[in-house]
Regions:
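Core alpha/beta nucleotide-donor-binding catalytic domains of modification enzymes
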Residues: 1-53
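Active-site cores that bind ATP or allylic diphosphates and position pyrophosphate for catalysis
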Residues: 37-38, 45-173
Protein backbone atom coordinates (compact mmCIF):
# COMPACT_ATOMS: atom_id res chain seq x y z
CA UNK A 1 0.00 0.00 0.00
CA UNK A 2 1.05 3.55 -0.47
CA UNK A 3 0.51 5.94 2.37
CA UNK A 4 -1.40 8.99 1.19
CA UNK A 5 0.34 12.21 0.32
CA UNK A 6 0.84 14.39 3.43
CA UNK A 7 -1.58 17.01 2.12
CA UNK A 8 -4.32 14.40 1.77
CA UNK A 9 -7.38 14.45 3.95
CA UNK A 10 -6.59 11.36 5.96
CA UNK A 11 -6.08 7.67 5.52
CA UNK A 12 -8.96 5.25 5.06
CA UNK A 13 -7.30 2.94 7.57
CA UNK A 14 -4.06 2.43 9.46
CA UNK A 15 -1.10 0.44 8.21
CA UNK A 16 -1.86 -2.10 10.96
CA UNK A 17 -5.46 -2.56 9.73
CA UNK A 18 -4.30 -2.71 6.10
CA UNK A 19 -1.75 -5.41 6.96
CA UNK A 20 -4.51 -7.37 8.69
CA UNK A 21 -6.71 -7.16 5.55
CA UNK A 22 -3.81 -8.34 3.39
CA UNK A 23 -3.18 -11.29 5.72
CA UNK A 24 -6.87 -12.27 5.53
CA UNK A 25 -6.58 -12.23 1.73
CA UNK A 26 -3.58 -14.56 1.86
CA UNK A 27 -1.08 -11.91 0.76
CA UNK A 28 2.33 -12.99 2.03
CA UNK A 29 4.29 -9.84 1.25
CA UNK A 30 3.10 -6.34 1.98
CA UNK A 31 5.17 -3.21 1.29
CA UNK A 32 4.21 0.20 2.65
CA UNK A 33 5.72 3.10 0.76
CA UNK A 34 5.67 6.59 2.24
CA UNK A 35 4.60 8.89 -0.59
CA UNK A 36 7.27 11.52 0.04
CA UNK A 37 8.66 14.15 -2.32
CA UNK A 38 11.71 11.93 -2.93
CA UNK A 39 9.49 8.96 -3.74
CA UNK A 40 7.48 11.05 -6.22
CA UNK A 41 10.67 11.57 -8.27
CA UNK A 42 11.32 7.85 -8.83
CA UNK A 43 11.05 6.73 -12.45
CA UNK A 44 8.84 3.82 -13.47
CA UNK A 45 11.95 1.60 -13.85
CA UNK A 46 13.21 2.81 -10.47
CA UNK A 47 9.88 1.85 -8.91
CA UNK A 48 10.16 -1.70 -10.28
CA UNK A 49 13.76 -1.96 -9.06
CA UNK A 50 12.68 -0.77 -5.60
CA UNK A 51 9.91 -3.39 -5.45
CA UNK A 52 12.39 -6.09 -6.42
CA UNK A 53 14.84 -4.93 -3.72
CA UNK A 54 12.11 -5.11 -1.07
CA UNK A 55 10.38 -8.33 -2.08
CA UNK A 56 10.34 -11.17 -4.59
CA UNK A 57 6.87 -10.96 -6.11
CA UNK A 58 5.34 -13.90 -7.92
CA UNK A 59 2.23 -11.91 -8.78
CA UNK A 60 1.04 -8.35 -8.46
CA UNK A 61 -2.58 -7.13 -8.59
CA UNK A 62 -3.37 -3.57 -9.66
CA UNK A 63 -6.36 -1.63 -10.90
CA UNK A 64 -6.61 -0.78 -14.58
CA UNK A 65 -5.98 2.91 -13.80
CA UNK A 66 -2.78 2.16 -11.81
CA UNK A 67 0.06 4.54 -12.73
CA UNK A 68 3.54 4.79 -11.28
CA UNK A 69 6.74 6.74 -11.81
CA UNK A 70 7.23 10.48 -11.92
CA UNK A 71 5.21 12.34 -14.56
CA UNK A 72 8.16 12.65 -16.95
CA UNK A 73 8.74 8.86 -16.88
CA UNK A 74 5.42 7.35 -15.85
CA UNK A 75 4.07 3.92 -16.70
CA UNK A 76 0.71 2.22 -16.42
CA UNK A 77 -0.62 -1.15 -15.34
CA UNK A 78 -0.17 -2.39 -18.91
CA UNK A 79 3.59 -1.68 -18.71
CA UNK A 80 4.22 -3.71 -15.55
CA UNK A 81 4.85 -7.09 -17.17
CA UNK A 82 7.42 -5.70 -19.62
CA UNK A 83 9.22 -3.69 -16.93
CA UNK A 84 9.52 -6.77 -14.69
CA UNK A 85 10.82 -8.80 -17.66
CA UNK A 86 13.45 -6.09 -18.36
CA UNK A 87 14.69 -6.74 -14.82
CA UNK A 88 14.83 -10.47 -15.51
CA UNK A 89 11.72 -11.33 -13.50
CA UNK A 90 8.62 -13.07 -14.83
CA UNK A 91 5.96 -11.67 -12.50
CA UNK A 92 2.30 -12.46 -13.08
CA UNK A 93 0.39 -9.18 -13.43
CA UNK A 94 -3.34 -9.24 -12.72
CA UNK A 95 -5.12 -6.06 -13.82
CA UNK A 96 -8.51 -5.62 -12.16
CA UNK A 97 -11.19 -3.76 -14.11
CA UNK A 98 -12.84 -0.73 -12.55
CA UNK A 99 -15.94 -1.49 -10.52
CA UNK A 100 -18.81 0.98 -10.71
CA UNK A 101 -21.66 1.77 -8.37
CA UNK A 102 -25.23 1.23 -9.58
CA UNK A 103 -25.18 4.93 -10.48
CA UNK A 104 -22.09 4.46 -12.66
CA UNK A 105 -19.55 6.10 -10.32
CA UNK A 106 -16.11 4.49 -10.06
CA UNK A 107 -15.57 2.81 -6.68
CA UNK A 108 -12.32 4.35 -5.51
CA UNK A 109 -10.54 5.59 -2.41
CA UNK A 110 -11.81 9.08 -3.32
CA UNK A 111 -15.42 7.86 -3.22
CA UNK A 112 -14.84 5.92 0.01
CA UNK A 113 -13.28 9.02 1.64
CA UNK A 114 -16.30 11.08 0.62
CA UNK A 115 -18.64 8.51 2.19
CA UNK A 116 -16.69 8.64 5.47
CA UNK A 117 -16.67 12.46 5.45
CA UNK A 118 -20.44 12.42 4.94
CA UNK A 119 -21.01 9.78 7.63
CA UNK A 120 -22.41 7.30 5.09
CA UNK A 121 -20.82 4.31 6.80
CA UNK A 122 -23.45 1.76 5.73
CA UNK A 123 -22.87 2.65 2.08
CA UNK A 124 -19.10 2.53 2.75
CA UNK A 125 -19.60 -1.08 3.93
CA UNK A 126 -21.75 -1.96 0.90
CA UNK A 127 -19.10 -0.71 -1.53
CA UNK A 128 -15.91 -1.82 0.24
CA UNK A 129 -17.09 -5.03 1.88
CA UNK A 130 -15.42 -3.88 5.10
CA UNK A 131 -16.84 -2.13 8.13
CA UNK A 132 -15.27 1.26 8.70
CA UNK A 133 -12.70 0.86 11.46
CA UNK A 134 -10.77 3.36 13.55
CA UNK A 135 -7.48 1.97 14.82
CA UNK A 136 -7.22 3.00 18.47
CA UNK A 137 -4.44 0.53 19.35
CA UNK A 138 -1.66 3.17 19.30
CA UNK A 139 -3.87 5.91 20.81
CA UNK A 140 -3.67 6.70 24.53
CA UNK A 141 -7.10 6.43 26.15
CA UNK A 142 -8.78 6.27 29.53
CA UNK A 143 -12.15 5.32 30.92
CA UNK A 144 -13.98 8.17 32.60
CA UNK A 145 -17.33 7.49 34.26
CA UNK A 146 -17.88 4.42 32.07
CA UNK A 147 -16.97 6.24 28.85
CA UNK A 148 -13.95 5.68 26.64
CA UNK A 149 -12.06 8.97 26.31
CA UNK A 150 -9.29 9.66 23.80
CA UNK A 151 -8.06 12.59 21.74
CA UNK A 152 -9.08 12.53 18.09
CA UNK A 153 -6.00 14.69 17.37
CA UNK A 154 -3.87 11.55 17.74
CA UNK A 155 -5.83 9.69 15.04
CA UNK A 156 -4.35 9.98 11.54
CA UNK A 157 -7.28 8.32 9.82
CA UNK A 158 -10.13 10.13 8.17
CA UNK A 159 -13.01 10.40 10.65
CA UNK A 160 -16.74 10.72 10.00
CA UNK A 161 -18.53 13.87 11.16
CA UNK A 162 -19.34 14.28 14.83
CA UNK A 163 -22.38 12.27 15.73
CA UNK A 164 -23.68 9.05 17.19
CA UNK A 165 -22.83 5.85 15.33
CA UNK A 166 -23.72 2.22 15.99
CA UNK A 167 -20.30 0.66 16.63
CA UNK A 168 -18.52 -2.37 17.95
CA UNK A 169 -15.57 -1.72 20.26
CA UNK A 170 -12.84 -4.34 20.16
CA UNK A 171 -10.10 -3.79 22.71
CA UNK A 172 -7.64 -6.37 21.39
CA UNK A 173 -6.46 -7.86 18.11
Amino acid sequence: GINPKPQSQGALDSVRIRAKYMDQLGVNSFVVIDFSENFSRITACGFIKLLLELTTPEAIVVGEDFKFGNPSDAASALDLQDLFLKEGRDVEVDIVEQILTEGGEKISSTLLRRLIKNGELKYFFELSGQSFQIDLMPIPYRFDDGKLVFSTDAIHQLLPPLGAYDTDLILSD
